[in-house]
Regions:
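FIC/Doc superfamily catalytic core
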Residues: 1-197
Length: 197
């Protein structure tokens, strides 16, 4: 079976060595059964991940406010930002329900991550998209009519490429996903979430 599309990248020896080193460290961490019995540590790490991911996208809530929202406490802050925290917590809590190779699961993750905060929740964008700094164009995403085919090709590559180490594959997917910018909102949050899937 030929792969329809292959993202443009070359695997260097340095990439391979880093991938092996990271994989070994993950295996070592996973071997500590005591960590599996520490739900508070896992929850705190999840809260820190959520806070960092949202802060990158200008969510102004502090780490303690994010923790309070997740703990069901009343927090004074922008309604949309509070909803973003609730959505992100649900999405990160659902990680084990997502199959990283299924496009439908990516759309489902987006619908969770952008619930009540985005008009096109769980749907690819139907408009042009770009990144701007004032009037200066930083990046223009592919046209909206190309998004479904580009995302299909990306997932087909992900499923069919059995030669690229999984860690490198996930990084290439992240890069390509951010380049395609398939959603009207939440691309960075979903890219970071999917890196965990």
């Amino acid at each position: 079976d030929d792969i329809m599309y292959k993202p443009p990248f070359d695997i260097t020896n340095k990439m391979l060595n880093l991938s092996i080193s990271i994989t070994e460290k993950i295996g070592l961490i996973n071997s500590f059964s005591s960590l599996k019995r520490m739900p508070v540590l896992r929850k705190n790490n999840k809260i820190k991940s959520i806070h960092s991911s949202l802060a990158i996208e200008a969510n102004s809530l502090s780490l303690s406010q994010v923790k309070d929202v997740i703990d069901g406490k009343v927090v004074l802050g922008p309604k949309k930002e509070i909803q973003e925290v609730k959505n992100a917590y649900l999405a990160y809590s659902s990680l084990n329900t997502f199959d990283g190779y299924l496009e439908e699961d990516l759309l489902r993750a987006h619908s969770i991550m952008t619930y009540l905060t985005c008009d096109e929740s769980g749907k690819y964008r139907n408009h042009g998209e770009g990144v701007f700094d004032g009037d200066k164009v930083i990046f223009v995403a592919p046209p909206e009519n190309m998004v479904p085919a580009l995302m299909n090709d990306l997932f087909e590559w992900l499923k069919k490429d059995n030669d690229t180490p999984i860690l490198i594959k996930s990084c290439v997917f992240h890069y390509e996903f951010v380049f395609i910018h398939p959603f009207g909102d939440g691309n960075g949050r979903i890219a970071r979430l999917w890196q965990n899937v």
